[in-house]
From Swiss-Prot:
This is GTP cyclohydrolase III. It catalyses: GTP + 3 H2O = 2-amino-5-formylamino-6-(5-phospho-D-ribosylamino)pyrimidin-4(3H)-one + 2 phosphate + 2 H(+). It comes from the Archaea. Keywords: GTP-binding, Hydrolase, Nucleotide-binding. Its EC number is 3.5.4.29. It comes from Pyrobaculum neutrophilum (strain DSM 2338 / JCM 9278 / NBRC 100436 / V24Sta). Pfam families: GCH_III (PF05165).
Length: 221
């Protein structure tokens, strides 16, 4: 079983509106500070977080106790101008766990499976066409992956540059996810007891593919 936590910043929209129309520079700085705190506190306990809209955050928490999750949320909330709450979901896949957030259930004892994907030759494409062209292609790819993940039980997130992270239900799921993707990509897949360690292994696998100039998938367990 996989475990997913969704963190909500309570009253965040109301806080932003209270700042008046000349507010965006403040909001962007605060969001950056909160995101840094979320990454710091969740990875410290072995979880793997990401943002939703910046007033919601998600984390894969396989193998991470509820007490450690609470501690991570409390630490991250110190960077927020409003309070934070969270729900925990458990399911056969990360996406199912997300849909069941707040529904209770047992522990998430399955190994965490995480993918780190990049687009091949994006650096050369950026030199040729500028960064906007590659950015739009990656955003389109993210949308395609997000729709496929609804059926396959995964979740996809934009990391920046040409990089995408995926919470996977199993290592083999990546092959079904990539079926039909029209961009050339390389993907490292990591498997570990805790999600952040799985992501580290995925990144290590991706770096191996890059160094060898190969595309495709490499799995590290």
């Amino acid at each position: 079983m996989h475990g997913v936590v969704v963190v909500e910043l309570k009253g965040y929209r109301e806080w932003t509106e209270s700042l008046g129309p000349r507010r965006e520079h403040i909001i962007q700085q605060v969001q950056s500070r909160i995101q840094a705190a979320v990454w710091r506190s969740f990875t410290a306990v072995g979880a793997l977080p990401h943002h939703f809209r910046y007033d919601f955050y998600i984390a894969l928490v396989n193998g991470v106790s509820l007490d450690l999750v609470k501690r991570a949320v409390e630490k991250a909330a110190r960077a927020s101008p409003v309070g934070a709450g969270f729900c925990l979901g458990v399911g056969e896949t990360p996406y199912e766990a997300y849909l069941r957030c707040g529904g209770g259930g047992g522990g998430a004892a399955s190994p965490a499976v995480v993918a780190h994907m990049d687009v091949i030759n994006s650096t050369e494409a950026t030199r040729r066409n500028g960064p906007l062209d590659v950015y739009l292609k990656v955003v389109k790819l993210l949308g395609q992956l997000g729709e496929r993940c609804k059926d396959l039980g995964c979740m996809a997130f934009y990391l920046g540059g040409d990089n995408i992270a995926l919470f996977l239900p199993s290592p083999n799921a990546i092959y079904s996810i990539l079926d039909g993707v029209d961009l050339r990509v390389r993907v490292g897949v990591g498997v570990a007891k805790r999600p952040y360690n799985a992501f580290v292994r995925a990144t290590w696998a991706l770096d191996r593919l890059r160094s060898a100039g190969r595309e495709g998938v490499e799995v590290v367990k």
